[in-house]
Regions:
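Cytosolic catalytic domains that perform sulfur/thiol-centered chemistry
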Residues: 2-288
Length: 288
């Protein structure tokens, strides 16, 4: 447990596969496999792939529903404090549980779950660097079937505040205060040539940093100096406050994590993102 405490203290976000191979039985592993596709349904989860083979002891998380507000009109809106605590408890996550999440989708979905955990104050939450691919590439075994977690005892406390996620009103205030807005979607969506909302385009003044541009081919994040170079080349000032958005507040967390890995202060993520902004009549949009 001493080494477990050490990794909590010194690691920022990413857990290397070599460490996890030794300590996977001492953490709560979350398998967040799924995808965002251009077809319908756009948001997909893959429990069947999980059951075919997952990291030993991993619990499946359906990112479309778990840790979300299921009554919200905007898809995958983050759950409120009470619902968050209940979901964490169900998954066996108590106040002191170390969590490591992974997926097979460039760790975008795992990163979203970790962002939510940390935003609600559960800072002992990390992403497996390279995700499922890194584990299998290292020759490490998977196990089939479904792991049913024991609820956490005592239950996870209800958070008293959230930091790192904002709603529509918070986004408007951030813009009024001059925050940098970063659009994590692909260039075609940013320019307005493609949209998954009623309206196309981007939030006026937003800089475009597609989240994939910050990842290596194997799904790992680029090195900090490379991240700084990519972000600055896109016009991002790492010394100023940053708010990131995408379509549903998911890939925006990859950009936000990249900003942190680059050594800058923790950004904020607009939860509703373009799913909300692009479907309203009272929000401005730019094309091109």
């Amino acid at each position: 447990m001493d080494e477990l405490c050490t990794i909590r203290a010194v690691i920022g976000l990413l857990v290397p596969v070599e460490w996890l191979a030794k300590h996977h039985d001492a953490v709560r592993l979350l398998d967040v496999r799924g995808e965002v596709v251009d077809g319908e349904p756009r948001y997909r989860a893959y429990p069947e792939r999980y059951q075919a083979g997952h990291l030993p002891g991993a619990v499946f998380v359906d990112w479309r529903h778990d840790f979300t507000d299921r009554s919200a009109t905007v898809p995958v809106t983050v759950a409120g404090p009470s619902e968050f605590a209940a979901e964490a408890t169900r998954l066996g996550i108590g106040a002191t549980t170390t969590v490591v999440a992974y997926d097979g989708y460039r760790n975008v979905l795992a990163g979203r779950i970790v962002w939510v955990l940390r935003s609600y104050g559960h800072h002992a939450a990390f992403v497996l660097d390279g995700g499922l691919g890194a584990w299998t590439a290292a020759g490490l075994a998977l196990e089939p079937g479904r792991v049913v977690p024991e609820p956490a005892v005592p239950p996870h406390p209800v958070p008293v505040r959230m930091e790192g996620l904002i709603d529509l009103d918070g986004m408007r205030r951030a813009i009024d205060l001059g925050a940098q807005v970063v659009d994590a979607r692909k260039e075609l969506e940013y320019a307005g040539g493609e949209t998954h909302a009623r309206r196309a385009g981007h939030i006026p003044g937003a800089l475009n940093v597609p989240h994939r541009s910050l990842l290596a081919e194997d799904g790992t994040f680029l090195e900090p100096d490379q991240l700084r170079a990519r972000l600055r080349a896109a016009g991002v000032d790492l010394d100023r406050p940053i708010v990131a958005y995408c379509n549903g507040g998911v890939s925006a967390t990859a950009v936000a994590h990249a900003v942190e890995l680059a050594g800058a202060p923790r950004p904020t993520v607009y939860d509703g993102s373009w799913n909300e902004w692009g479907n309203r009549d009272d929000t401005p949009a730019e094309m091109g």
